[in-house]
Amino acid sequence: MTRKSRRLILIAACGAVLALALGLILSAMSGSIVFFRSPAEVAAQGVAPGTRFRLGGLVKDGSVKRGPDQNVEFAVTDTNATVPVQYRGLLPDLFREGQGIVAEGTLDVGGVFRADTVLAKHDENYMPREVADALKAQGRWQEGGGKDASKAAPKDAAKPETADATLGQRSER
């Protein structure tokens, strides 16, 4: 073999090993990729039953029904469409009607989303980007987490005194 043919064989072998490694990585990742959908996308696209995805939106007011053995039924809405959800387990402490959530699970034949994980928003300004985009597209987005700015505490509100200041005032005799 000539030097040139050995180099070509080595390059081809390295290319084959890299292609195999890339194929293994992609096949391993395909099982862990879970897509996010809003209720409007679920209604419009007709998601196939058994497809695993994340459903994000707001818990519809008046929809939470607690059953025996930690069974909970509620509806998730993006104000354009609503998807019924069934979940069994402990809900996050921040879960309540009107709050943003992301649930992971599958859609059954009847159109009910069977969640195995429910995540609630964790501060008053957080909302999943996809949910916020869907609300903005519908013209229903409110800046500041939907709270009335006039009810917010003024920035120069009195702050509680520190222990040092209080002790300093008392020690003067």
Swiss-Prot record:
Heme chaperone required for the biogenesis of c-type cytochromes. Transiently binds heme delivered by CcmC and transfers the heme to apo-cytochromes in a process facilitated by CcmF and CcmH. It is a single-pass type II membrane protein. GO terms for cellular component: plasma membrane. NCBIfam families: PRK13254.1-1 (NF009727), PRK13254.1-3 (NF009729), PRK13254.1-5 (NF009731). The chain crosses the membrane at residues 8-28. The keyword Coiled coil does not apply. Keywords: Cell inner membrane, Cell membrane, Cytochrome c-type biogenesis, Heme, Iron, Membrane, Metal-binding, Signal-anchor, Transmembrane, Transmembrane helix. It comes from the Bacteria. Heme binds at residues 122, 126. Residues 29-173 are periplasmic. The keyword Cytoplasm does not apply. Residues 1-7 are cytoplasmic. InterPro entries: CcmE, CcmE-like_sf, NA-bd_OB-fold. The gene is ccmE. Belongs to the CcmE/CycJ family. Residues 145-162 have a biased composition (Basic and acidic residues). This is Cytochrome c-type biogenesis protein CcmE. GO terms for molecular function: heme binding; metal ion binding. Pfam families: CcmE (PF03100). GO terms for biological process: cytochrome complex assembly. It is found in: Cell inner membrane.
